[in-house]
Swiss-Prot record:
Pfam annotation, one family: Transferase
Keyword Acyltransferase: yes
Originating organism: Capsicum chinense
InterPro entries cross-referenced by the UniProt entry: CAT-like_dom_sf
Annotated EC: 2.3.2.35
Keyword terms, alphabetized: Acyltransferase, Transferase
Protein name, as recorded: Acyltransferase Pun1
Transmembrane residue ranges: none
Amino acid sequence: MAFALPSSLVSVCDKSFIKPSSLTPSTLRFHKLSFIDQSLSNMYIPCAFFYPKVQQRLEDSKNSDELSHIAHLLQTSLSQTLVSYYPYAGKLKDNATVDCNDMGAEFLSVRIKCSMSEILDHPHASLAESIVLPKDLPWANNCEGGNLLVVQVSKFDCGGIAISVCFSHKIGDGCSLLNFLNDWSSVTRDHTTTTLVPSPRFVGDSVFSTKTYGSLTTPQILSDLNECVQKRLIFPTDKLDALRAKVAEESGVKNPTRAEVVSALLFKCATKASSSMLPSKLVHFLNIRTMIKPRLPRNTIGNLSSIFSIEATNMQDMELPTLVRNLRKEVEVAYKKDQVEQNELILEVVESMREGKLPFENMDGYENVYTCSNLCKYPYYTVDFGWGRPERVCLGNGPSKNAFFLKDYKAGQGVEARVMLHKQQMSEFERNEELLEFIA
């Protein structure tokens, strides 16, 4: 599974820092981080969007430097967008505060000496895709004082481009990232006709205040990138429908969701591939914007999450109908809870602090803990900078292990799963016959 792209394919043409187009008011100078924000390491969320053929949108038809023009267009719109997303133009003052000093976001312009299809069609695509992400940044720990947003635009020989973003997890989650991308792309797309002013709502520490739980020091996630690998799996609509029908009949669960059946199958197959199979636990992250009262709008920026989990202590627990039945039960329980006062993620962080370990490390005595982030129904494939929908949206390969990321495949056609496991476990996992039955 070892594979690396030659560094000679990539040449950095320009590196600059993009400041907000207007100064941040002094009243907004310091952005307070919530308890959940503080519990996260200073990592970036890395993602990239591939646009196969970009037609130049030139006011000056004599301009022949396409990369320079595209970069200028994106830089101008990014500068305008950062006025509303001002914390991402600042720096971490400490683990509790962002200094919104308009330092700016880092912006890289890169040429890649191959066609986009060579990357997208590569047998090790999840590794090949990393060529369009800023070097050494995906999932890295961002030191205090570093940029909280890093953007790279990469132009391929075929004329296609990739736009990648490393977005500080300290300030926002996957929903926050999508809000930013949609706003930035809208400003880019409509720059000649309207003056869009994005209106994100930063909640800071107003929902999960550190006054309740106390402040935290920044946790450091230590893992060996060379020992962790990512696998991209596609569950086509027809096979996914067959899996859902099978599980519904055998479990009695009405209309099992795509995320329920796929995460259960991944959990079962990953656990089976582990050298120490049982007991195991599967932890699902929840976006709680619509679960708390009063409901928060989708444009709320922050880490607004909770968790629910299921466990397996014997082989009967690992049967798909049982797993899906338990997932449905636990998510229903989660929706009945007060997700501010009874937030399971906060309870796990507090318990981990008490025991001097990282969250989800040997959780409740379970050595095998898998996490699942469900981004299905998050419209990443609608992010349009003016060149149509992306051909592919990818997540940067990183040092995480025992992690599943689910999202729509090409605007709702099935599910794409990014699975991160230890490389020895992955070699067993990807040969599982039950898994192979339902993937493309």
